[in-house]
């Protein structure tokens, strides 16, 4: 079953349209490529400033390796530089155990 890296970003301190454009045209594709993810999706939590990105991996070992990788650290640094550390994020790995 698939495993997902879910990144939630609180964007209330930045321009939402600029953030959305940057994520759409630059960051999502770059992160998918750097992670070697099967897929990358993103969206907004309704009626909020919370942005969610979801990266799909084949198994937990791959996701955990990415979670601890230098590539992720470099993307985090690039992200923080772009947004002057004004966007707080959480990162979780979700291991899907059942599907119908």
Residue ranges of each PLM-predicted region?
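Residue-level signal for secondary-structure boundary sites
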Residues: 15, 61-63, 99
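Short amphipathic alpha-helical segments
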Residues: 15-39
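An amphipathic, aromatic/His-enriched active-site/gating alpha helix that lines ligand/cofactor pockets
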Residues: 34-38, 56-93
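Short, low-order "capping/linker" segments at domain edges
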Residues: 93-100
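Short, well-ordered beta-strand segments in beta-rich or mixed alpha/beta enzyme
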Residues: 3-10, 40-70
């Amino acid at each position: 079953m698939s495993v997902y890296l879910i990144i939630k970003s609180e964007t209330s301190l930045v321009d939402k349209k600029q953030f959305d454009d940057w994520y759409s045209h630059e960051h999502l594709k770059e992160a998918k490529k750097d992670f070697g993810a099967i897929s990358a999706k993103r969206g907004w939590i309704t009626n909020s400033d919370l942005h969610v990105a979801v990266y799909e991996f084949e198994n937990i070992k791959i996701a955990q390796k990415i979670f601890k990788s230098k590539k992720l650290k470099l993307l985090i640094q690039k992200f923080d530089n772009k947004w002057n550390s004004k966007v707080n994020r959480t990162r979780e790995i979700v291991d899907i155990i059942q599907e119908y």
